[in-house]
Amino acid sequence: MKKLTIVDIAKMAGVGTTTVSRYFNGGNLKKETRERIKEIVDKYNYTPNTFAKALKSTDSKIIGVIVPCLHSYISGNTLKYLDKELKENNYETLIMNANFDENKQLEYIKKLARMNVDGIILLPTTMSKAYESTIKSIDVPVVMLGQEGEYTYSVEYNDFNAARDLTNYVLASGHKKVAYLGVSEDDVAVGYYRKLGVIRALEKYNLESKNILITNFGMEEGYEIVRENI
């Protein structure tokens, strides 16, 4: 038997395809109509194509999430709790891994918009002007995590305070030879504000900020820099 379609279900139930679409999208239907469609769906074990449905409906119930990588602790935990929260609100998560490539992140923003997702959650590691122009060019709400975006919604961490307080704690414990290992200022939150928090704490103790070490997000390079400077 060929794969069942919405058209087939509509014919069997004696309703229009719009009514069947409304059933799958959780729209209002008469009780008997809903039960009739459900009986057919259950009988043939029919599962709607979420992405095909998304392209045809106003409400896709899909949220695209663009992460810089899949192997980091932060990305993994962020995805875990985002997916949990979204599923509790009847949304599906579509994950795109940019592998620390800004061009890929920008490409995925446009790709997800073409797929008619209801929203995009973005974890950027750089903040170039290209993000602003790309986000403004699409008609999909975008939320940035971890970076400030004046032109869109953003959820930020206070990297400056976190780094300053941590450094203050280390210095107050009697340690004076402090090194900072961070990324470049292309990542404004982590590369600039976090480093600035460390420097301000060192200044409070009249210490020079000479051990400022810059790396990328890769574990191997970070390991080598630490090994060379111990």
Which residues make up each language-model segment?
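Short beta->alpha connector loops
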Residues: 99-102, 123-128, 148-149
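N-terminal helix-turn-helix/winged-helix DNA-binding helices
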Residues: 2-4, 42-80, 89, 99, ...
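Bacterial carbohydrate/catabolite-sensing allosteric modules
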Residues: 43, 84-89, 137-144, 148-230
